């Protein structure tokens, strides 16, 4: 009997390890753009890690005010939370684990529907590449 999908983003799924973040951005990672976002991902090994670890970055260079940066991060988190099942199912089938970073590329705010569409596209493309 399958359990219903839980659309949550627990703390365990957030990428906080400085070592993994450094590895993600220094080498061995791949990226896919879907303006105004870019996803950077890297398969990882480790038993104690969740299937997906997530990092969201909105640079201060793009938005000086924290209110705007927080809004964009909230939009990305919400979109990821709604559409992460596709990625989780793909990773469970292949037995892989992955570290993901969403990076904001634009200097302007976008509607939540547009951000959600781009996040969904990037998740789908990443799942296809990792499968």
Residue ranges and their predicted role:
Residues 1-131:
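Positively charged, solvent-exposed patches that mediate nucleic-acid binding
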């Amino acid at each position: 009997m399958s359990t219903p999908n839980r659309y949550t983003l627990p703390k365990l799924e957030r990428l906080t390890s400085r070592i993994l973040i450094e590895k993600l951005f220094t080498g061995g990672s791949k990226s896919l753009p879907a303006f105004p976002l870019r996803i950077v991902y890297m398969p990882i090994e480790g038993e104690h890690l969740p299937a997906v670890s997530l990092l969201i970055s909105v640079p201060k260079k793009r938005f000086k005010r924290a209110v705007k940066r927080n809004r964009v991060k909230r939009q990305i988190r919400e979109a990821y939370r709604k559409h992460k099942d596709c990625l989780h199912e793909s990773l469970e089938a292949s037995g892989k684990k992955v570290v993901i970073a969403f990076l904001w590329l634009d200097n302007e705010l976008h509607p939540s529907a547009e951000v959600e569409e781009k996040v969904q596209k990037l998740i789908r493309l990443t799942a296809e590449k990792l499968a």
